[in-house]
Every structure is written in C-alpha cells, then in structure tokens.
C-alpha cells in the first residue's frame, strides 16, 4: 500500500465525485456545465443557474444502450436523493434521444459535446439546483451507472484517500440556526479562525476534520480539537449557545482551557466497516458482533 495517502478536500470530493467518500477507481467525474445553460431555452436549467445554483453532468461513456428499466432505476435513485426527476441524453449517430433534446440549441449541444467529450453511444445525465444537493444526486447516479456497467468487476485496486477540510458549520433550515457539522469542539482551519472569532459565519468555514476512505467506503474519521478558551467560546456563540448555557454545560472545559491545554485530536476507525470490506459483505449488519435489534436477536 503506497504511502502517504493522497488528500482531497471535502469540496473537491463533492464537486468531482458527488460524495464525501469518493470512489475514484473509475472516471465519470462530475462536470459543471452551468455556463452553457445561463440563457437556455430549457427553463429548468436556466432557472437553476439564475437562482444561484448549478447544472452538473456526467458522461457514462458507451452506456447509451441503457435499457428503459435501467433509466427508470437511475431516475428512482435521483428522486430518492431529492431530485424532481432525471434529465438524460442517449447519444445516437442520427440524433440525441432525450426528453430535453428539443429544448437545446445547436450551440448548447456543441458546447456540451466539447465539455463532456460526448461521442456516439454515450449516456449523459444531469442534475440541477443548489450546488451540494445537485452534486449528491449525481454522485449517487454515477455509482449506480458504474454498477450497471460493471466498471469495477474484478478490480483489486486499493484506493486509500484522506478527505479533509469538511465544513465547520451548516445552516439548519428547520431550527433556523447554525449547527456543528462534526461536533462543537472541532477546530477550524487556521485561515478561518479569525472569521469564527469575529462571528463571520458561513457554510464556507472549514474544519480540521478528516475521514480516511478506501474504495468509496469511509473507514474512520476524526478531527483536531479546539484547545483555547476564546476560540471555544466563539464556537459556542456561533451555535447559539449563550454564555450562561456554556458555563452550565461546559464550564469545566472552558476553565481547563484557561489554564492551558495542549493541542490534541484523534481518529476513530470503524472496524466493522473494515471487516465488512474484507468479507465482501453488503452491510455491516452481516459482520457486527453485537445484537442487531432492540431485542438482542439477529
């Protein structure tokens, strides 16, 4: 196993593979084609871009022969991930067979061909909307395409990867407040510390949080933790925790930080996931040693 493992930021992983645990043993990367559809006659794509979202696409090379059942299965995967449907194009020698083809201009088709290296026999699939959900939807569709195409059949490669710089905070629409993506003690990257201290909150704040990934499966995760009182207090404030609540719930931690605490962090491996991969099992339910339901029975 070659070391050190390569590193990829969370944003790069989502943008290119549509997953925070990317399967990199085959291509079919996500491509941003938003600029092609800014003024498109296909209003679904044009409105996604005008509303600040994106249009992402993948080219499943040579999969233009996908059956109706396979297209239906891909559509179901997209819908279950939050899409309203799944736009696709089957590229044939005589035409582009697609429910959306009639809305695309010749110029848009030419630009798509160049951006995605489209050839006869390809299957092009799209997702449109806010960036993160669109990446996630197309990432799931990408994996299912690979399964249908048997791209990983007999593949013995071990692709280890560190995914780093996960988001520090995210906006909870239901609660209308910022929440910690990992946990409230996660340290921001050095470049973002001052933003947290000054209350400049956004989903772009990056955490010193990381996962180790093997062949598209998360083996474990961890983070570097905050060890200064002022930074920890700023994090609590960002999450809507008042000074009184912080004192009541976490006073012992803040006091300890006042006297000085060493930089610290860690990593927890999911051994059940590792055993699952070794055994070629489909689920950790097949390998965990503990009872699998609340009655203590299999």
Tell what function each PLM region has.
Residues 1-298:
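Class II aminoacyl-tRNA synthetase catalytic cores and aaRS-like
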């Amino acid at each position: 196993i070659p070391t050190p493992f390569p590193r990829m930021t969370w944003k790069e992983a989502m943008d290119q593979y549509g997953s925070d645990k990317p399967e990199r043993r085959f291509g079919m990367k996500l491509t941003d084609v938003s600029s092609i559809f800014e003024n498109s006659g296909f209003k679904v794509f044009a409105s996604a871009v005008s509303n600040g979202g994106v249009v992402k696409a993948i080219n499943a090379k040579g999969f233009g022969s996908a059956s109706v059942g396979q297209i239906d299965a891909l559509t179901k995967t997209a819908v279950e991930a939050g899409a309203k449907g799944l736009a696709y194009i089957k590229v044939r020698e005589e035409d582009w067979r697609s429910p959306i083809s009639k809305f695309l201009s010749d110029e848009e088709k030419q630009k798509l061909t160049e951006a995605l290296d489209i050839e006869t026999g390809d299957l092009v699939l799209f997702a449109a909307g806010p960036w993160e959900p669109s990446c996630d939807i197309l990432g799931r569709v990408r994996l299912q395409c690979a399964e249908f195409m048997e791209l990983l059949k007999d593949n013995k490669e071990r692709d280890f990867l560190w995914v780093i710089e996960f988001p520090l905070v995210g906006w909870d629409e239901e609660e209308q407040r910022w929440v910690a993506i990992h946990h409230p003690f996660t340290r921001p990257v050095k470049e973002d510390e001052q933003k947290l201290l000054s209350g400049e909150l956004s989903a772009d704040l990056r955490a010193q949080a990381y996962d180790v990934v093997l062949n598209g499966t998360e083996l474990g995760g961890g983070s570097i933790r905050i060890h200064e009182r002022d930074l920890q207090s700023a994090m609590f404030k960002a999450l809507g925790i008042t000074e009184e609540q912080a004192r009541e719930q976490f006073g012992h931690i803040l006091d300890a930080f006042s006297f000085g605490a060493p930089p610290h962090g860690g990593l927890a491996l999911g051994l059940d996931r590792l055993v699952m991969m070794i055994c070629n099992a489909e689920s950790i339910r097949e390998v965990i040693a503990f009872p699998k339901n609340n009655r203590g029975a299999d």
